[in-house]
């Protein structure tokens, strides 16, 4: 059974009187920095001088330093720049300026788990991974609520690493909703497997194949778009709010019966085998190696695949439908 921490299980005390350097001021970095500051903690920012976020951070009242300077001043360093930028920034600006006993926090375990970042032994290494976008992290905090998070300890130099991790989670509002204890390996692998097989890869391809099938059968593309893409949000909202069983109780009996009898024929047991194969590539590190190579080559395969999606008929129809629906 998962161990879940609530607000009463965490304290901000371990962070009181300490300097927290948030590295990065993108959507997630900005949200976490603002929340920590609003929780009464001392937050500075480490950014690239001249970067587009520098002036914004200054305007919003933060003390801003170049990354190496911020790390040197910090007791806690939160690495909130994109995954693929982290190894170079770590090697050149973060690690050379770390003090012994510093707490280093990541929002995703990718670089630590796959060995792209190797921290020195004299620092704590923790992870606080909000399970929601930065905008939600900020908005929920301001509403007196929070976005759930995962928390993990990779390296416990001080003997208090989990206390620090929970303090960070409390500071950004996550313990209000609940924080689940995990490991860097579990967070990284489940995140990648879930993205590839369901949330991004699987769902996207299911929608595209459904659209293609309806159009090939002679139905109007606009009607096909509504049936397989637009209405997907309505069903996912029901699942998110009520669970799968609750969703079924929120649709018609015809939809229930058709879905329960035909769905398993479309997504059958053979799909699980292919999911296991994708999972094996993630767990072995094969996917990480492939992606790092692709990124270092400038992303030619990614650009090609993105262009194919952009030019798919469902996207062309979608532009018109979203203009009709939302005035975009």
UniProtKB/Swiss-Prot annotation:
It catalyses: (2R)-2,3-dihydroxy-3-methylbutanoate + NADP(+) = (2S)-2-acetolactate + NADPH + H(+); (2R,3R)-2,3-dihydroxy-3-methylpentanoate + NADP(+) = (S)-2-ethyl-2-hydroxy-3-oxobutanoate + NADPH + H(+). Its cofactor is Mg(2+). The keyword Amino-acid biosynthesis applies. Mg(2+) 2 binds at residues 191, 227, 231. One of its GO terms (molecular function) is ketol-acid reductoisomerase activity. GO terms for biological process: isoleucine biosynthetic process; L-valine biosynthetic process. The active site is at residue 108. Mg(2+) 1 binds at residues 191, 195. InterPro entries: 6-PGluconate_DH-like_C_sf, KARI, KARI_C, KARI_N, KARI_prok, NAD(P)-bd_dom_sf. It is an enzyme of class 1 (oxidoreductase). Gene3D superfamilies: 6.10.240.10, NAD(P)-binding Rossmann-like Domain. Coiled coil: none annotated. Substrate binds at residue 252. Residues 183-328 form the KARI C-terminal knotted domain. Its EC number is 1.1.1.86. NADP(+) binds at residues 25-28, 48, 53, 83-86, 134. Binds 2 magnesium ions per subunit. Keywords: Amino-acid biosynthesis, Branched-chain amino acid biosynthesis, Magnesium, Metal-binding, NADP, Oxidoreductase. Belongs to the ketol-acid reductoisomerase family. Involved in the biosynthesis of branched-chain amino acids (BCAA). Catalyzes an alkyl-migration followed by a ketol-acid reduction of (S)-2-acetolactate (S2AL) to yield (R)-2,3-dihydroxy-isovalerate. In the isomerase reaction, S2AL is rearranged via a Mg-dependent methyl migration to produce 3-hydroxy-3-methyl-2-ketobutyrate (HMKB). In the reductase reaction, this 2-ketoacid undergoes a metal-dependent reduction by NADPH to yield (R)-2,3-dihydroxy-isovalerate. This is Ketol-acid reductoisomerase (NADP(+)). The lineage of its organism: Archaea, Thermoproteota, Thermoprotei, Thermoproteales, Thermoproteaceae. The gene is ilvC.
